[in-house]
Each structure stands twice: as C-alpha cells, then as structure tokens.
C-alpha cells in the first residue's frame, strides 16, 4: 500500500475557495443568537482562525467588532433572574459561550478575565450540570458532558469542585446500574458524549 496525500493542490485550492466563501457569509450575516453552535460566537471562532491563517486585517477588525457585539448581546442573559438551566447547554447556551471565551483567552486571541463575564452565572451553570447527570441527560451538546467540557477549561477551584461532583454523580449512577437502561449512545445527546 502506498501513501498518497489526502489533499492535492487542486483540492486545496477548492477547499480554500469554500473557506473564503464561508468567511464572507459569516462576516456579512447578522444573527440575534450569541451562542456557539448556531450563533455569533461560533462564527467568530471560525473567523478568528480564518484571520490568523490569512492575515486579512479587514476581516480581523470586523470580527473583533462582532466579538464585542456578541458580548453585549450576552450581558442581559448574564444578569437575568430567570432559570439558567434552560440556558446552560454547550450547543446554544452559556456553557458553550463561556467555553469560547476561555478558549479565546487560552489561545491568546483575547485577554481579560472570563470571570468578569461569566462569574455571575457560573454557579447556576455548574449546578445544572449536576442536575443533568441526576436526570440522565449526559449528552455533549444539550446535557452534562458539554458543561463539563466548559469546566475542564476553567482554572478556578470552584469549577474543579463541580467536576469532582460530576464524576462522583456519574460513578454513583454507574454503580447502581442506572446507565444500563439508556438507549441513546450518540455523542451529541447520549452516553457517548461522556467519552
């Protein structure tokens, strides 16, 4: 068996053409959703890496503005008294948004303290992670394991304590055979999201 590259020069040109097209769409499309998977912060994540690869200053300036607009859209949610559990998912909620901020900081795309933005809602998000485990919602996108990923990237003691509690709750469910009845083994919503 001989080795051959997955991407030929011709294919790379087609891929870059599509990437440029996606970047243009993201840059010129407004969304009222500030979240990760279907909203602005996901677009911004793509665009920051796009700018890093291409060195496109115009896109970088617009992406930076989009980032601050996204933070502004998020502020009302961060100061709300409503039930955060419904807004805690990784896919379309505050844990995905917080993960993105932590990722940007770790990659030195942004600077600052994530706690300044997320600190008021973190306790509620982390409690909802435990609630999800206790109610058999383990999935990555909408359940406990996505919130756990957010916790893994946080350097603070509070998040680590909740991760320990997450593992303990999961261990209790495994020991009492509570995972045996699950029929959802998918990554996004089921047990595979844990691994």
Where do the PLM segments sit?
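Low-complexity, Ser/Thr/Pro/Gly-enriched N-terminal "stalk/linker" regions
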Residues: 1-65
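Well-ordered alpha-helical scaffold segments within catalytic/enzyme domains
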Residues: 1-4, 42-56, 96-110, 146-158, ...
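Alpha-helical solenoid scaffolds that mediate protein-protein interactions
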Residues: 22, 26, 50, 63, ...
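Solvent-exposed loop and edge beta-strand segments that line ligand/cofactor-binding
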Residues: 23-41, 77-94, 130-142, 177-192
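Post-signal peptide N-terminal segment of secreted/secretory-pathway proteins
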Residues: 55-88, 92-94, 98-109
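Short sequence/structural elements of tandem HEAT/ARM alpha-solenoid repeats
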Residues: 61-64, 112-119, 161-168
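Well-ordered mid-protein domain cores that form the structural environment of catalytic cofactors
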Residues: 94-131
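Solenoidal tandem-repeat scaffolds enriched in leucines and small polar residues
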Residues: 138-195
């Amino acid at each position: 068996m001989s080795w051959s590259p997955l991407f030929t020069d011709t294919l790379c040109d087609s891929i870059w053409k599509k990437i440029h097209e996606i970047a243009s769409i993201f840059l010129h499309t407004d969304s009222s959703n500030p979240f990760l998977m279907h909203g602005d912060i996901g677009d911004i994540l793509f665009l920051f890496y796009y700018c890093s690869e291409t060195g496109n200053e115009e896109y970088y300036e617009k992406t930076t503005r989009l980032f601050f607009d996204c933070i502004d859209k998020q502020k009302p949610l961060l100061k709300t008294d409503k039930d955060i559990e419904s807004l805690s998912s990784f896919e379309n909620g505050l844990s995905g948004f917080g993960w993105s901020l932590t990722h940007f900081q770790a990659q030195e795309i942004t600077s600052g303290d994530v706690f300044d933005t997320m600190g008021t809602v973190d306790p509620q998000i982390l409690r909802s992670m435990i609630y999800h485990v206790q109610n058999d919602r383990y999935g990555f996108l909408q359940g406990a394991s996505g919130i756990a990923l957010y916790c893994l990237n946080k350097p603070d003691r509070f998040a680590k304590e909740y991760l320990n509690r997450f593992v303990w709750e999961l261990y209790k469910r495994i020991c009492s055979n509570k995972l045996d009845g699950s029929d959802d083994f998918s990554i996004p919503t089921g047990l595979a999201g844990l691994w």
